[in-house]
Amino acid sequence: LFFFSVLSISQDIGFSNVLDAVYPDENNLKFPKVYSADTAKNTTYNINLVVYSEKKSTVKLNYSSLEFDRISFNEVLDVPVEQNTGLDSRTEKFRGNINPFVIRRAPFRIYEIIKPISNNVINTNSNFSLINVKIPIHKNLKSDKYQINFTIKLNDMKFNLKLKLNVHDVN
């Protein structure tokens, strides 16, 4: 008898701070389903969603909130990094000095270009995908604690995420 096994990648999705380094090929990330943050009135709060899935997966994004009705989703596209920054020049190649402070050795790809999602659906191109969420915080919103519920369907799996925002006055 011949046994064939198909290895399928697990699927997951969670919040990620916009300052976290996220790559299309590999990451050592957690996928928190609940995230709390502080923000100010009259700004736009940004948070990322990291999707871990098979390539060509379908991700459908939805949210519910009484206070926030203009949330936008943006797919963050990856670009190549071909050379590392040099210690005393634009790249290491100019003088040949290796920069020990880089977070990853080139060549690799990194997320950088933001593309608006018009119908709240994307199809993934790599095992990790990055979705930027922009939440306008109105200047007349009361300083308080708010919650936004996200329902995300990744292929046939449903994920429920909660973003807790503490909105503050800026004086």
Where would I find each of the regions flagged by the language model?
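N-terminal signal peptide c-region/cleavage motif recognized by signal peptidases
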Residues: 3-7
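Surface-exposed binding patches on compact interaction domains or structured appendages
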Residues: 12-31, 54-133, 141
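Short, solvent-exposed loop/turn segments enriched in Ser/Thr/Gly
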Residues: 31, 41-48, 129, 140-149
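Outer-membrane beta-barrel proteins
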Residues: 35-37, 121, 138
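Short edge beta-strand/loop segments characteristic of extracellular beta-sandwich folds
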Residues: 46-52, 134-136
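A structural signal for beta-strand boundary/capping segments at domain termini and interdomain linkers
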Residues: 128, 158-160
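Beta-strand-rich extracellular modules
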Residues: 151-155
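An acidic-aromatic substrate-binding cleft motif
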Residues: 160-171
